[in-house]
Curated annotation (Swiss-Prot):
Binding residue positions for Mg(2+) 2: E267, N269
Pfam families associated with the record: ATP-grasp_3 (PF02655)
Stated role: Catalyzes the synthesis of carbamoyl phosphate from ATP, ammonium and bicarbonate. Proceeds via a three-step mechanism, i.e. the phosphorylation of hydrogencarbonate to carboxyphosphate, a nucleophilic attack of ammonia on carboxyphosphate yielding carbamate, and the phosphorylation of carbamate forming carbamoyl phosphate.
Key word Transmembrane helix present: no
Protein name (record): Carbamoyl-phosphate synthase
General remark: Several lines of evidence suggest that obesity is associated with elevated levels of intestinal methanogenic archaea. Consequently, this enzyme may be an attractive drug target in the treatment of human obesity.
Note describing how the cofactor binds: Binds 2 magnesium or manganese ions per subunit.
Annotated domain remarks: Lacks the domain involved in allosteric regulation present in CarB CPSases.
Organism the protein comes from: Methanobrevibacter smithii (strain ATCC 35061 / DSM 861 / OCM 144 / PS)
Annotated Gene Ontology cellular component terms: cytosol
């Protein structure tokens, strides 16, 4: 079995799993100084874009391609390459298709998609710089966003018309969305060949008018929010994934309004994401390793169900880890009760335990 991985930044998460399964690994990477280039069996430094990875997949006679790209801009080119390569050869590319990327990479199209499939999403309208004062019909506070962007980029919680005016000093248009006071929830869904399985919902904290970046929040799992049925989160996530009809990882963000007792869908990411460590800690399923299983033809809902475990877990920003040495593989819970991830100085620790009490003791000892 030979797999081409596109991008090296996330590869250390799965290097141990690739080796355990006897898979020959090739990486294409556009940055010759990128991390993890010493890990795979073979590396090709290539120009940006998908033309070279496509040609290398063919020339090296690989069995599958797994893009490991955790940012949004390249996803449409990856999707186009997927459709071209799969049409021209029998090489599967474990990634979202063009339709799914177009629907999820534009927040306005995502809103329209939710409405089409009957999934509740916060009230919204599109505003323009020239006439927003007369067109704005929603009560404050509202959330202003751009169609594209990730990680909280270009988002502002506006509490007054002056806040909106300030936002339009930089932008010509905005998606204006009702501010939902409540709980932030994320969930990963795995999908391949028409099979979809939602994993454990993650609690990311309460919404704030300050709009705290996700990387600065403490996250916990399983999601324990009063009044919220986690089965509803999983059913809704499954419905979204099934209607997107694509392959790979889907990370979905939701808000739960306690006042309205309503679950709202916010957005979808069709790529590896920051939730994956906490998901793995909680339920024992590593979404990146499942991409490898998809490539190897070993992915199935039954296999996922057989792997499911049940732990209490938390993810905490720590900056720089100063605790005990971890066991190999470092990015796996196979021989560890916690893993450390993120760049030096901006590290996070994800800890798991059999009980809430044991988790609290771990946190007290480590943090």
């Amino acid at each position: 079995m030979k797999i081409l991985f596109i991008g090296s930044r996330l590869y250390d998460d799965i290097d141990y799993y690739v080796r355990e399964n006897g898979i020959e690994s090739i990486i294409t990477e556009s940055n010759e100084d990128a991390i993890n280039l010493d890990l795979p069996d073979q590396v090709f430094i290539v120009p940006r874009g998908m033309d070279s990875p496509k040609q290398i997949a063919i020339s090296q006679n690989v069995d599958a391609v797994v893009p490991l790209i955790g940012i949004d801009p390249p996803l449409i080119e990856v999707a186009k390459m997927k459709e071209e390569l799969e049409a021209e050869t029998d090489i599967p590319v474990i990634a979202a298709n063009v339709r799914a990327v177009r629907l999820t990479s534009d927040k306005i199209k995502t809103k329209e998609f939710y409405n089409e499939i009957g999934v509740p999403t916060p009230q919204y309208q599109i505003l323009a710089k020239d006439d927003f004062e007369s067109k704005l019909k929603m009560e404050f506070p509202v959330v202003l966003k751009q169609g594209q962007g990730q990680g909280g980029k270009d988002i502002k919680v506006a509490e007054s018309l002056d806040d909106v005016k300030e936002y339009f000093e930089e932008f010509d248009h905005a998606l204006c969305e009702k501010f939902i006071e409540g709980s932030e929830i994320s969930i990963e869904v795995l999908g391949y060949n028409g099979e979809y399985v939602p994993l454990s919902p993650i609690y990311k904290g309460e919404t704030t008018l300050e709009g705290i970046h996700p990387l600065n929040k403490i996250k916990t799992a399983p999601c324990l929010v009063e009044g919220l049925d986690n089965n509803l989160v999983q059913r809704t996530a499954y419905k979204v994934a099934k209607n997107l009809g694509s392959d790979g990882i889907f990370e979905m963000d939701f808000m739960f309004s306690k006042d309205e007792q309503q679950l709202y869908a916010i957005e979808v990411n069709t790529r590896p994401n920051g939730t994956r460590y906490l998901t793995t800690a909680t339920c024992g399923v590593n979404s990146l390793c499942e991409l490898v299983n998809m490539a190897a033809g070993k992915f199935s809902i039954k296999d996922i169900q057989d792997k499911l475990e049940y732990y209490y877990a938390t993810e905490i920003p720590i900056g720089r880890y100063k605790g005990p040495d971890l066991n190999e593989p470092l990015k796996s819970f196979k021989n560890n009760d916690w893993v450390v991830h993120g760049p030096e100085g901006y590290q996070r620790i994800t800890i798991r335990a059999d009980s809430k009490e044991q988790l609290d003791r771990y946190v007290e000892d480590l943090i």
